[in-house]
Amino acid sequence: MENIETILRLAEDKILLVQNLKALQEYKVEFLGKNGIVTGELKKLGSLNEQERKEFGLKINKLKDKIQNIIKAKAEILEEQELNFKLAADKIDLTIPARRYKQGSIHPITQCSEELIQVFSQFGFTIENGPNIENDFYNFTALNFEDDHPARQMHDTFYLKSQENNKPLLLRTHTSTVQIRAMKNGKPPFRFIAPGRTYRSDSDMTHTPMFHQIEGLVMDKNINMGHLKYVITTFIKSFFENSNIELRFRPSFFPFTEPSSEVDIRMNKNDKWLEVLGCGMVHPNVLKNVGIDSSEYQGFAFGLGVERFAMLKYNIKDLRQFFEGDMRWLKHYNFGSFDIPNLAGGLTK
């Protein structure tokens, strides 16, 4: 009995003075391990009679439980101390400037495209899409291009080696191809825009081999040039956020519209006129090619270059800069990720 009390006091004295978990584990082995002090006391049971074994065994088990509880309590204290020490060591200094968070930005072409689309959404336009690789019918024939039209030549159009019905495929030169597909596959009335990439064999300060267009089509009964002028005028003033902007509809020629017009604008009276888009009433031959009766339905179409509008609105001088990937230029002209327009105005994609 005295030996058991001595062992308990010894365990308490040693364990209470422990400063770390490693030393605590060593004392646990010393007292409760296979060759520990308490285990040594258990070995004495073999020399005792049955009654003594029962009493002594009960005391040893109580000793073992008390030492385990002491160790457990000390372990909790040491673990809390170590956690507090670690937290103090890892403390964040809130006065230190934060690292700059790297994030993407919106390219001016994307920004301009979304702004243009948002404006057209106010007129109830929907979006139609089509393939970048087209055949001769959708890109030229259905749009009333003559067989010898210069636009069909290889110096203007990218032709592919692949063929369809013994005729070469090509990269579309305008998104008017989308209008043809939509009219052939649907029934009027129509009111949609067709944004997308287009391709022409040209490269200088104002032309690139690949560029972005948005073309639009409105078709219904009794549509006339007055509707066309209203939509274009309202669109231009809304996009450039200038109600005083001047527009000039200048007679022109396009195979797929008749009459045709090119639209010039100037921000102020003293500015030079700038050409921004082409438009006109859909040619009866185009309607015939897609199976629509031109005596019942009329429509107008328009087409604009996204890069051209971006250059005018954001004051960008050289078209080629859009595609050079100069990080300094992009840092200056790109838009924040949250600046992109909200398309909740009713547009459907």
UniProtKB/Swiss-Prot annotation:
Keywords: Aminoacyl-tRNA synthetase, ATP-binding, Cytoplasm, Ligase, Magnesium, Metal-binding, Nucleotide-binding, Protein biosynthesis. Gene3D superfamilies: Bira Bifunctional Protein, Domain 2. The keyword Magnesium applies. Its main location: cytoplasm. It comes from the Bacteria. Its EC number is 6.1.1.20. SUPFAM superfamilies: Class II aaRS and biotin synthetases, tRNA-binding arm. One of its GO terms (molecular function) is phenylalanine-tRNA ligase activity. It is found in: Cytoplasm. CDD domains: PheRS_alpha_core (cd00496). One of its GO terms (cellular component) is cytoplasm. One of its GO terms (biological process) is phenylalanyl-tRNA aminoacylation. Its cofactor is Mg(2+). It catalyses: tRNA(Phe) + L-phenylalanine + ATP = L-phenylalanyl-tRNA(Phe) + AMP + diphosphate + H(+). Binds 2 magnesium ions per tetramer. It is an enzyme of class 6 (ligase). Mg(2+) binds at residue 258. Belongs to the class-II aminoacyl-tRNA synthetase family. Phe-tRNA synthetase alpha subunit type 1 subfamily. HAMAP family: Phe_tRNA_synth_alpha1. PANTHER family: PHENYLALANINE--TRNA LIGASE, MITOCHONDRIAL, PHENYLALANYL-TRNA SYNTHETASE. Tetramer of two alpha and two beta subunits. This is Phenylalanine--tRNA ligase alpha subunit.
